[in-house]
């Protein structure tokens, strides 16, 4: 073995050792040890793989880590080139992928990052209830760590928080597969943390979560009461944020309303942008059903879709589940046809969960007037009274959450105000709630009073 080859082998060994800081030892032995470093010329590392699958797998999963490790060893930012063997031509360098390479299912790349490719911005039905959150999510997906960091999405179960978080991750990976993205629930984060402590692999756990470019962590409220997990996530958050990495979180409440979480964590959740997703109005619920129906080769009467949309009001996941049940029954038993009576029978357990009476704007206005000790006539007047501004916005916000009326219809009930005023009120109160626990608690109390009386 000549000296040059020996030197190259030593350099490659150093690179592999450096890679162990960010990649498991098992992965190094499987994918990198069989690789041979042929040359280093003009800031290019020419590598030889024993089989095309090595090139494919490294390029798909570890290229950014390999470039980083090579930079730290060589003090230069190299381009990674794989040599191909061409019959009669010896080794030939190429920067292109081998066309004949059998590729694994595309979804496996996303699954390794905790992502499900069925969630996209294209199949997220946007309405007034979610347009601000959807716009913020798209901005983050287009420019990670430059638009809003962190982005905190909140709302009740089944309204689309997970869909938007997954869409962010999928969009980023589609645009640049080398960006390190990880979606995880806070429960998974906690379980991995506990397992790492038990196995003595806490260093590897920290490398996994502190070396990534985009962290999407769902259901952050699960960390409540878990002091050591909160401590670990606090330092993970700081490491990523200080490194200008994107953080997206979701919870069932605004940050200020989260219980049993450290104040220093809640404070960090509020550093960026908070965006609430509200229950969809009837127009959006109907649009969701029609969009979902496109996945089936069935034609269901619009009156049946309206029936479902009118009765399942607060949970998109439940709405979609009802349609799935209906379509399954129709395709198996009814040759694609189903009646309203059959729909009522099939969905009786879901429909029975819905409020039997409708909450009106007047009911909301009166409850808010009681809470703020103001006159009803001032609430609905056209006059601009500063003392009434906040209560009026609170009432508009609750009207968006608890009624099926459009923005314009709500505005009409507040002295003939336009839809833009209502939308502004919705966004303002949503933002205030994320930072004012007293306001968030008051709105929660009024909501409970209104819904429990139904």
Curated annotation (Swiss-Prot):
One of its GO terms (biological process) is DNA replication initiation. The keyword Cytoplasm applies. One of its GO terms (molecular function) is ATP binding. Gene3D superfamilies: 1.10.1750.10, 1.10.8.60, 3.30.300.180, P-loop containing nucleotide triphosphate hydrolases (3.40.50.300). It comes from the Bacteria. GO terms for cellular component: cytoplasm; plasma membrane. Signal peptide: none annotated. Residues 76-113 are annotated as: Domain II. ATP binds at residues 158, 160-162. CDD domains: AAA, Bac_DnaA_C. Residues 331-454 are annotated as: Domain IV, binds dsDNA. It holds the Pfam family DnaA_N. Keywords: ATP-binding, Cytoplasm, DNA replication, DNA-binding, Lipid-binding, Nucleotide-binding. Residues 114-330 are annotated as: Domain III, AAA+ region. Residues 1-76 are annotated as: Domain I, interacts with DnaA modulators. Domain I is involved in oligomerization and binding regulators, domain II is flexibile and of varying length in different bacteria, domain III forms the AAA+ region, while domain IV binds dsDNA. Oligomerizes as a right-handed, spiral filament on DNA at oriC. Belongs to the DnaA family. Plays an essential role in the initiation and regulation of chromosomal replication. ATP-DnaA binds to the origin of replication (oriC) to initiate formation of the DNA replication initiation complex once per cell cycle. Binds the DnaA box (a 9 base pair repeat at the origin) and separates the double-stranded (ds)DNA. Forms a right-handed helical filament on oriC DNA; dsDNA binds to the exterior of the filament while single-stranded (ss)DNA is stabiized in the filament's interior. HAMAP family: DnaA_bact. This is Chromosomal replication initiator protein DnaA. The gene is dnaA.
